UniProtKB/Swiss-Prot annotation:
Its EC number is 7.1.1.-. One of its GO terms (cellular component) is plasma membrane. PROSITE patterns: COMPLEX1_49K (PS00535). Residues 210-595 are annotated as: NADH dehydrogenase I subunit D. It is a peripheral membrane protein. Gene3D superfamilies: Cytochrome-c3 Hydrogenase, chain B, NADH:ubiquinone oxidoreductase, 30kDa subunit. NDH-1 is composed of 13 different subunits. Subunits NuoB, CD, E, F, and G constitute the peripheral sector of the complex. Pfam families: Complex1_30kDa, Complex1_49kDa. Residues 1-186 are annotated as: NADH dehydrogenase I subunit C. It catalyses: a quinone + NADH + 5 H(+)(in) = a quinol + NAD(+) + 4 H(+)(out). This is NADH-quinone oxidoreductase subunit C/D. NCBIfam families: NuoC_fam, NuoD, PRK06075.1, PRK11742.1. In the N-terminal section; belongs to the complex I 30 kDa subunit family.
Amino acid sequence: MVTDNSKATDNSANPNMTQHAVLRELGHKFAGKFTEQFTFDGIPTIWVSRQDLLDVLMYLRTLPKPYVMLLDLSAMDERLRQHRDGLPASDFTVFYHLMSLERNSDIRVKVALSEDDLKVPTATKIWPNANWYEREVWDMFGIVFDGHPHLTRILLPKYWEGHPLRKEYHARATEFTPYFLNNAKQQFEQENLRFVPEEWGMKRSGRDEDFMFLNLGPNHPSAHGAFRLVLQLDGEEVIDCIPDIGYHHRGAEKMAERQTWHSYIPYTDRIDYLGGVMNELPYVMAVEQLAGITVPERAQTIRVMMSEFFRITNNLLYFGTFIQDAGGMTPVFYMFTDRQKAYDVIEAVTGYRMHPAWFRIGGTAADLPRGWQRLVREFLDWMPQRLDEYVKAAMENSVLKGRTQNVAQYDAKQALAWGVTGAGLRATGVEFDLRKARPYMGYENYDFEIPVGYNGDAYDRCMVKIEEIRQSLRIIRQCMDNMPSGPYKADHPLAVPPPKNRTLNDIETLINHFISVSWGPVMPAGEASMMVEATKGINSYYITSDRSTMSYRTRIRTPTFAHLQQMPSVINGSLVSDLIIYLASIDIVMADTDR
């Protein structure tokens, strides 16, 4: 029997919730003005009225040890949700995920909206990075944010009809009329790409001369991804820039609503397509949290080892292309050789290279193959010396230092305000890594360091990523030397089939097994989330189950969405040549940004 755990309570009914200090503080300031909700992830979650929203958000932003980062902002269409006993009445819900580094804690604030009044005040005056998140919510749900400076579509073309994450919006291509592209439609599409400065409040001329508007992109996916930067230039100086994203948007969150909990795993690989199993980890961990599955120690160690291999392959590509964008052509070819050696190990273990879809709910798809230690050891013996050579040849080169030091510089306060995580945050001196701050998958058992920089410039961001490779090598060696015995998958009915003898002798077990395999397992109703320190920063999955074989709502928070939004605040006033270095330093993959 599955029970519904997604229930709201008053402020005193749930001791597990009231133990959070922030809820006690809110109770003193806003007594009787919020309702608590239980979630499987343990993050304190409250519902507030639309009238109190900005007051609550501002209080959380300014209290001692404040919630300085708006980690995520999104919404959910609740009109078809059945298992929501005790929650405030809501057709649509907007939620704000806030993070405090000083407290090392989060809080989730929700606002209930009725279908006939989909308006909520903008939070852009509290957190500047609310801008893009609110545009995405309007794009996907049609919720209006009063006072937003430029509420337009962001992932979809401006002529798009409808809001795809509403429940009445079709989820399959076969439910739409066939798409075709004739000459008239092609001209229409191209005309809609024309940039009109006045639509963005930009002037065409200054006091003495006209400004030049330059389309940088859309680029080929191999050149940092399919996106466009519209630059307002005065000579070589960037007056303003507008990142134009969405070219790689594929509706990843909508797809989750039509896939079983298991069959959605391959789709996660295509988010950050350089991250491999690192993409799968937060998703399967969130489902395991929802289902109450404990992953065996061996499976945890295997997951850590393979995740760190993909961190290395990602950072090697980043390192090579960073040097290439700065003018050095040779190193990237050497680093592709090193990546190939890492992929040899990955392919031997998972059967695939970049998109293995190898993690499973409860563990992994298979155990480690015979001879895996030899392959891992060979790579561990090979890589450190190569890395030393690259640093000496490239990062200690005076020309590269001149191109990258004190370029695209920002401090910790700016990084936190814009939701920057990963190497971009640590390069400003903030020693925050989820593997240390909030260990998962047994990371608390590994001996490794958190690389940090202090200048917050392009050079420091690259040096942090290089040192991450060294720390990943340390972690992998510890995995190899201390690989525990035992199963590679949890013995749980939602993760593995029942024993063969039971299916042969018990008809009910056989029927349940048939339904589970053909339709997919049914997960308990409720909400769960998991975040990991991915290759580019914090990647999280926030899933809602309505006691079904499919997710009711899957929210994917990706790091590069926040990192690209910060770009104008960093690069305006700099030169175009500095912009190229900045792009190289932030490690973007547009499938990660656009989802």
